[in-house]
Amino acid sequence: MERVLGLLLLLLVHASPAPPEPCELDEESCSCNFSDPKPDWSSAFNCLGAADVELYGGGRSLEYLLKRVDTEADLGQFTDIIKSLSLKRLTVRAARIPSRILFGALRVLGISGLQELTLENLEVTGTAPPPLLEATGPDLNILNLRNVSWATRDAWLAELQQWLKPGLKVLSIAQAHSLNFSCEQVRVFPALSTLDLSDNPELGERGLISALCPLKFPTLQVLALRNAGMETPSGVCSALAAARVQLQGLDLSHNSLRDAAGAPSCDWPSQLNSLNLSFTGLKQVPKGLPAKLSVLDLSYNRLDRNPSPDELPQVGNLSLKGNPFLDSESHSEKFNSGVVTAGAPSSQAVALSGTLALLLGDRLFV
């Protein structure tokens, strides 16, 4: 029993900046900071009633817990206790975690009602447990990974996927050490609607082709590639065609984009209706954009004149805010062709899923 409770301790925790006590608790959330040289791990039990739990490990290694925790213990007698937890969102930051501890924790969380998991600034070490025929981990809606390194390198996504139930809807991977996935090992993500690969400046268009394993994302609707080393809209289009994904929304903001003169034509996803090209340094409207869009964001670029209608796709909501040719940041104009220019389109203007609003919110249109 002590070993199982020790494993539960690993599940329920993270941090705010160095509070006097390891854990702070309010009605819904609990935050623990274990950066002290001799942390009081037992204080994490204060988080048992919280829905939103955060753990900050202070960069320490949890290798020693392998001798104290049975990651394969029978959880039968604790099932009702785990199910009764209010835990919905869990964040774990700044630690060195053996894969046996991580996947053992996911097995326990599989009994809970956890919906969102965030792992940040982690190093996952060692050999993982044998693969399972059926996932026993949590039924997550959202998984956020930022600066997480894995001992299994390119096989890490396939390995992690074995421990998650197949209902994942939103996956965010930032500052990844490898996005060159072993696609033959990756299973299909049958419910994934939003994939965010932002803040991976080394990814580039070639890397995007490797990351978007063909036929593994059949329900993908929204792809975010902010600050991801993209160079041309046409190059991204080619990567999407190779992956055979049918997007509705694409965010290419905060990349240094250029117009690829003479680039071969590309067939954009037929359902694409929202394209964000803000903060990309564009001096003119790039050629080869989709012929028709509901929303096109060209704000905060280097356009020195108002684009003429024949330079633009057929678009319902066009944002040009923050470009040099404007006298002010707020500008709207109706073209004879029916193009409407708006200073700052709201997220409600995008006819995408609620998942997009959940993950990207106002970041899709800056």
UniProtKB/Swiss-Prot annotation:
UniProt membrane topology term: Lipid-anchor; GPI-anchor
InterPro entries according to UniProt: Leu-rich_rpt, LRR_dom_sf, Monocyte_diff_Ag_CD14
One cellular component (GO) term of this entry: external side of plasma membrane
Signal peptide: 1-15
Swiss-Prot/TrEMBL keywords: Cell membrane, Disulfide bond, Glycoprotein, Golgi apparatus, GPI-anchor, Immunity, Inflammatory response, Innate immunity, Leucine-rich repeat, Lipoprotein, Membrane, Repeat, Secreted, Signal
Lipid attachment in record (GPI-anchor amidated asparagine): 336
A GO MF label: lipopolysaccharide immune receptor activity
Residues with glycosylation annotation: 33, 147, 180, 276, 317
Disruption phenotype annotation: No visible phenotype. Mice are fertile and appear healthy when kept in a clean, microbe-free environment. Mice do not respond to bacterial smooth lipopolysaccharide (LPS). Contrary to wild-type, they do not develop toxic shock or secrete TNF in response to LPS. Surprisingly, they have fewer live bacteria in their lungs and bloodstream after inoculation with bacteria and are not killed by an inoculum that is lethal to wild-type; they are killed when the inoculum is further increased.
Keyword Lipoprotein: yes
Coiled-coil stretches noted in the UniProt entry, renumbered to this chain: none
Disulfide linkage: 23-32, 30-47, 183-213, 237-266
Location, primary (coarse class): membrane
Positions annotated as propeptide: 337-366
Top-level taxon: Eukaryota
Matches recorded under SUPFAM superfamilies: L domain-like
Subcellular location: Cell membrane; Secreted; Membrane raft; Golgi apparatus
Known partners and oligomeric status: Belongs to the lipopolysaccharide (LPS) receptor, a multi-protein complex containing at least CD14, LY96 and TLR4. Interacts with LPS-bound LPB. Interacts with LPAR1. Interacts with the TLR2:TLR6 or TLR2:TLR1 heterodimers; upon interaction with ligands such as diacylated lipopeptides and triacylated lipopeptides, respectively. Interacts with MYO18A. Interacts with FSTL1.
Domain note: The C-terminal leucine-rich repeat (LRR) region is required for responses to smooth LPS.
Its job: Coreceptor for bacterial lipopolysaccharide. In concert with LBP, binds to monomeric lipopolysaccharide and delivers it to the LY96/TLR4 complex, thereby mediating the innate immune response to bacterial lipopolysaccharide (LPS). Acts via MyD88, TIRAP and TRAF6, leading to NF-kappa-B activation, cytokine secretion and the inflammatory response.
Stated name of the protein: Monocyte differentiation antigen CD14
Taxonomic source organism: Mus musculus (Mouse)
The gene coding this protein: Cd14
